[in-house]
Regions:
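Gram-negative outer-membrane beta-barrel transporters
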Residues: 371-381, 385, 461-467, 583-585, ...
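N-terminal Sec signal peptide and the immediately downstream disordered periplasmic leader
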Residues: 1-67, 73-78, 188, 237-238, ...
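Outer-membrane beta-barrel translocator/receptor signature
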Residues: 109-110, 122, 130-133, 139, ...
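C-terminal beta-signal and adjacent terminal beta-strands/loops
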Residues: 585-587, 594, 735-741, 761-824
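Acidic, small-polar-rich N-terminal luminal/periplasmic segments of exported/outer-membrane proteins
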Residues: 35-164, 564
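Membrane-embedded beta-barrel scaffold of Gram-negative outer-membrane proteins
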Residues: 313-319, 324-340, 519, 525-531, ...
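Structural signature of Gram-negative outer-membrane beta-barrels, strongest in the C-terminal barrel
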Residues: 232-236, 370-373, 379, 383-387, ...
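Periplasmic-side early beta-strands and strand-to-turn transitions of outer-membrane beta-barrels
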Residues: 156, 164-166, 172-174, 186-285, ...
Length: 824
C-alpha cells in the first residue's frame, strides 16, 4: 500500500455597467411626451442606438446616481441576462448571455471591459464607480472593432471629461442604516477655451456581504478611496486631447459565510488505528448550526484583500477633414494583496491555514486608428493595437498535512514504515509523533503577455441600408512559469512544475464580423449580424505536479455567432422597443471547474512530483491529494432572445421592462467533476475519491455554462409630481431571477425578486435632490452561490476532517438609506 500525503496547491489571485436598458437614458424630467435619441459609440463612432446592428444596453452617469449604483453587484438589477458576482472578495466574475468567466482562469475575459476605450480588468474598473459619463454593454462576440476579442460581449465605461466653456459639477452623499456610506463629486474648471480640468473623487464604505465572523467577533467591511484628474487640451479646432490620471485604493475584509449543521471534525485516535477505527472527539466543534439567514462565518483567520492602482490614460483625436486620426494609450500599475485563511469552513478547529498572495502587474496599451469621416456612401477604417502585461505573483502559503483527523497539536503513533522504510507498515511506532507535518509552500509565477493586432473595416450607408464588416489579425504571445519551493518538514525546490512544452504559446487568430442594418421606416430598423471571436488557452497557475497535460494547459477557444433583431418606435415615439434573437456555437469553450479533488503521482511520501510512479485510484491511500481549480475546454452552444420595451406614457412617467432568455449549455461534454460515489454525475457523497483512471474524475454533461438561470427580467419606473419649482417623485426598480437546479453543485436555487424603492424631492431646475430609499424591500435572504459540498481536508492515514458546512453567498438583507445630490 502506497502511503500518500494530501497536499494543497496554491490558489492564486490573478489578477458594468449600470447599463440599464435604453429607458434609463430617456428618463429625464421634461415636458415632452416622447423618448429622445440615444447616442452610442459601440461601433467606435457616434451613432443613434437604433442604427447599430447589435444588441446594446446603455446607461448614463445620471442614471447610476439616481439608482445609487455604487457596487458592481447592483448593476445586474438593470440588465437582464447579466450576472456580476464577487463570491470570494478577490475576484469579479461576469456572466452575459449565460456565458461566464472567472478571472483566475488566466485567459482573456468572456466579457471584455474597456475603460475610456482601453482594455482593463474588472478588479480595477468595477471597484470604484463614480463620475461616469456613459456605460454601454455590447452583447455578442466582439472580434473586430476593439483590441481584445471576446465571445460574450464588451462593456465600455467612459468617464466624464471637462468641457471648455463653463464651470459645472455635482456632489452626492449617501448613508445607510447598516453602516454604509458613499460620497462622490466631480467638477470642471475651465481655464480658457483651450484648456480645462476636471477633478473627481470617491470615498466609500460598506459591510460587503454583511457576514459576522463568530470566532473573530468582527463583521465584514470594506473601504474604497479614489481620485481622478482629467486635463483637456484643445489647441485648435481640429485637435483635442484628454490626459487622465486615476488613483484607487481599496481595502476589504470579507469573511466567508458558512451554512450547515457544523460537525465534530476531530477523531480520538485509538490503538486500533490500523484497523480503521476512529472514535469521534465530541468535545471540539467546527461551530454552531448555521442557516443562510444567520449571515455568519466560522473562519478563524482573516480574509483581507487590498488593491492599489495607478492608471494613466491619454486620448487624442485629430480631424484631418477627410478622416480622423485617433490615439488612445494607457499605463496601469496595480498591486493586489490577499491574506486569508484557506480553511474557510473551519474543518480543522484551532488551526489557521494562512495564504499570502501578492500580485503586482504593469499593463501598457496603445491603439492608433484612422477612419473616414463621411456618414453616407463608402466609409473605411484601419487600426493597430498593442498591449503588454508583466509582473510576478508570489505566494507564501501553509500546506501542512496531518497524519490523522485529530487535533493539530496532538501526538499519535503512526505505522512503523512511515519513519523507517524497512519496518513493517502493519505495526505502530512505539512512541507518538506530532500529528502535524509542517510544510510551507512558496510559489513564484512570472507573467509576460504580449498582444498585437491589426484591423480593417469597410462601411457602406445609403438609402436606409448600412452594411459593415471587417477583419482583425492578432498575434498573441504568452510565457508561463510556476516555480515551486517546499519548506519545513518536507523540503524541495525551487522547481519549475510546468512542462517545458507548455510554457510558451503563440496564437495568430483572424477574427471579425459582418452586419446589415436596414431602415424599413424612419421608426423601424431590422438588422442581421455575424461575429467570430477567439480566445487563447492558458496554462494553469500552480497546478499539481505530475497531472496530465489537458489539466495543465487549455486549447484555444473559437466561437461563431448569428443574430437578428428589430428596433423601433411606436405611438409617436412614446414607446421604443428592441427584439434580438441569437445563436452561438463554441469550439472548446474555456471554463473553470472549482474545488476539484485530484490524485497525483508521488514517490511514496505523498508529495506530487514529476517522474514519480503512476497513480492507482483503486489502491492509493488517501485516495486524493487535495482540491484544485482546473481550467478545461468543452464544446458548447448558446441560443436565446432579448426584448426591451421603454416608454414615456406621460411627460412625467417613465417606464421600462426588459427580459432575456439565454440557454447556454455544454454539448455532451466530458469535464472535470467530483464524483465520490462513482455515479458518473457530480456528487460529494462520502470520502473524497477519484472515479476512473485519470488524475480527476470526469462527468458527461449537457449542463449550464454558468451558475445562472436561463431567464431574467428587469423593470424600472419613475413617476414625477411637479408642484411649481419643486418635483416630488417615486422610483422603483425590480430584478426578477427565477429559481433553477444546478447540476454542478447539486443545489436547487430559489427564485429572487429584488425590489428597490426610492422616494424623494427635486429642487428648482433639478439643482438638488433629496432621496430616501430601501434596498431589498421584501427582505429576501436567498442563497445566490453555494459550494459543491461540505468543507473537507483529507488526513494522510485515511481519515477526513469534515466541517459540516458549505460555503455560501446570500443576498444582502434589507437596507434603508438617504441620498443628497447637488449640481452646479
Amino acid at each position: 500500500m502506497r502511503m500518500k500525503r494530501a497536499t494543497r496547491a496554491a490558489l492564486l489571485c490573478a489578477g458594468v455597467s449600470a447599463f440599464a436598458v435604453p429607458a434609463l437614458a430617456y428618463a429625464q424630467a421634461g415636458s415632452e411626451n416622447s423618448t429622445s435619441d440615444i447616442v452610442v459609440t459601440a461601433t467606435r463612432r457616434a451613432e443613434n442606438l437604433k442604427d447599430v446592428a447589435m444588441s446594446v444596453n446603455v446607461a448614463t452617469g445620471e442614471q447610476l446616481e439616481k439608482f445609487n449604483i455604487f457596487d458592481v453587484k447592483d448593476v445586474q438589477q438593470l440588465a437582464p441576462g447579466l450576472e456580476l458576482t464577487n463570491t470570494t472578495g478577490r475576484n469579479n466574475t461576469t456572466t452575459l448571455r449565460g456565458i461566464t468567466f472567472d478571472p483566475d482562469q488566466g485567459t482573456d475575459p468572456a466579457v471584455q471591459l474597456y475603460y475610456n476605450e482601453i482594455p482593463t480588468d474588472a478588479q480595477t474598473a468595477f471597484t470604484a464607480i463614480y463620475d461616469i459619463e456613459q456605460i454601454e454593454v455590447l452583447r455578442g462576440p466582439q472580434g473586430l472593432l476593439r483590441g481584445i476579442s471576446a465571445p460574450a460581449g464588451s462593456i465600455t465605461i467612459r468617464t466624464r471629461r471637462p468641457n471648455f466653456d463653463q464651470i459645472e459639477g455635482y456632489g452626492q452623499a449617501t448613508a445607510t442604516d447598516r453602516g454604509g456610506y458613499n460620497v462622490q463629486l466631480g467638477t470642471t474648471l475651465p481655464f480658457n477655451e483651450n484648456l480645462s480640468l476636471r477633478v473627481a473623487g470617491l470615498v466609500d464604505g460598506n459591510r460587503i456581504n454583511h457576514v459576522y465572523n463568530i470566532p473573530r467577533d468582527k463583521r465584514s467591511y470594506g473601504q474604497t478611496q479614489s481620485a481622478r484628474v482629467t486635463l483637456g487640451w484643445r489647441p485648435t479646432e481640429n485637435l483635442t486631447t484628454y490626459l487622465t490620471y486615476q488613483y484607487l485604493q481599496a481595502d476589504n475584509n470579507q469573511y466567508t459565510q458558512s451554512f450547515g449543521p457544523g460537525n465534530t471534525p476531530f477523531s480520538a485516535v485509538p490503538v486500533a488505528t490500523l484497523a480503521g477505527i476512529f472514535i469521534p472527539d465530541t468535545t471540539v466543534r467546527s461551530g454552531p448550526p448555521l442557516s443562510a439567514t444567520d449571515y455568519a462565518s466560522v473562519q478563524e483567520g482573516g480574509f483581507r484583500t487590498r488593491n492599489r492602482t495607478h492608471l494613466i490614460n491619454l486620448a487624442a483625436d485629430l480631424d484631418l477633414g477627410w478622416s480622423t486620426l485617433s490615439f488612445v494609450g494607457a499605463h496601469q500599475y496595480s498591486k493586489l494583496q490577499t491574506n486569508r485563511d484557506l480553511d474557510t469552513t473551519n474543518a480543522i478547529p484551532g488551526y489557521i491555514q494562512y495564504s499570502n498572495v501578492v500580485t503586482p502587474y504593469k499593463v501598457d496599451t496603445g491603439e492608433l486608428r484612422l477612419q473616414s469621416n463621411n456618414d453616407e456612401g463608402l466609409g473605411w477604417g484601419v487600426g493597430a493595437f498593442y498591449s503588454r502585461q508583466t509582473g510576478t505573483t508570489t505566494v507564501n502559503q501553509d500546506a501542512s498535512q496531518f497524519w490523522y483527523a485529530a487535533a493539530p497539536g496532538s501526538f499519535n503513533p503512526v505505522p512503523g514504515c512511515i519513519l523507517d522504510p524497512t519496518a513493517p507498515c502493519d505495526t505502530l511506532t512505539p512512541f507518538p509523533i506530532p500529528n502535524t507535518l509542517a510544510i510551507r509552500t512558496l510559489v513564484d509565477v512570472p507573467v509576460n503577455v504580449k498582444t498585437a493586432s491589426f484591423s480593417a473595416n469597410l462601411r457602406y450607408k445609403g438609402g436606409g441600408l448600412t452594411v459593415e464588416g471587417g477583419l482583425r489579425y492578432t498575434i498573441r504571445k504568452q510565457v508561463d512559469s510556476t516555480i515551486l519551493t517546499l519548506v519545513g518538514d518536507v523540503n524541495s525546490g525551487p522547481e519549475e512544475i510546468i512542462p517545458a512544452s507548455l510554457r510558451r504559446s503563440t496564437d495568430k487568430p483572424l477574427t471579425g464580423g459582418l452586419s446589415v442594418n436596414y431602415a424599413l421606416t424612419d421608426d423601424l430598423n431590422v438588422y442581421a449580424a455575424y461575429g467570430h471571436s477567439f480566445r487563447s488557452g492558458s496554462t494553469g497557475v500552480s497546478v499539481p505536479a505530475g497531472v496530465s497535460s489537458d489539466l495543465i494547459r487549455t486549447d484555444p477557444e473559437k466561437t461563431d455567432s448569428y443574430e437578428v433583431g428589430l428596433k423601433g418606435s411606436v405611438f409617436d415615439r412614446k414607446v421604443n422597443f428592441t427584439v434580438a434573437a441569437f445563436y452561438q456555437k463554441f469550439d472548446g469553450f474555456l471554463s473553470r471547474f472549482t474545488g476539484i479533488f485530484y490524485n497525483c503521482p508521488d514517490f511514496g511520501d505523498g508529495t506530487c512530483a514529476l517522474g514519480a510512479p503512476p497513480i492507482d485510484n483503486a489502491t492509493d491511500v488517501p485516495a486524493t491529494n487535495g482540491g484544485f481549480d482546473f481550467n478545461y475546454n468543452a464544446p458548447a452552444k448558446v441560443k436565446g432572445i432579448e426584448v426591451t420595451i421603454d416608454a414615456r406614457p406621460t411627460p412625467n412617467w417613465d417606464l421600462n421592462i426588459a427580459a432575456s432568455y439565454a440557454r447556454a449549455r455544454f454539448s455532451n461534454a466530458l469535464v472535470p467533476c467530483n464524483d465520490f460515489a462513482g455515479t458518473g454525475t457530480p456528487n460529494q457523497d462520502g470520502t473524497p475519491r477519484i472515479t476512473g483512471t485519470g488524475n480527476v474524475s470526469f462527468c458527461r454533461t449537457n449542463g449550464r455554462l454558468a451558475e445562472a438561470p436561463d431567464f431574467g427580467l428587469t423593470a424600472n419606473t419613475e413617476l414625477r409630481f411637479p408642484m411649481g419649482d419643486y418635483t416630488p417623485f417615486i422610483r422603483g426598480l425590480l430584478a426578477y431571477r427565477p429559481g433553477f437546479y444546478s447540476e454542478r453543485v447539486q443545489y436547487d436555487y430559489r427564485s429572487r425578486e429584488q425590489i428597490n424603492l426610492f422616494v424623494g424631492l427635486r429642487g428648482p431646475e433639478s439643482k438638488w435632490e433629496l432621496t430616501g430609499f430601501v434596498r431589498n424591500l421584501l427582505n429576501q435572504k436567498r442563497i445566490s452561490n453555494i459550494a459543491g459540498g461540505e468543507g473537507q481536508v483529507n488526513a494522510l492515514l485515511g481519515s477526513t476532517f469534515n466541517s459540516g458546512y458549505r460555503s455560501v453567498n446570500v443576498t444582502v438583507p434589507r437596507e434603508f438609506g438617504i441620498t443628497a445630490n447637488v449640481k452646479w
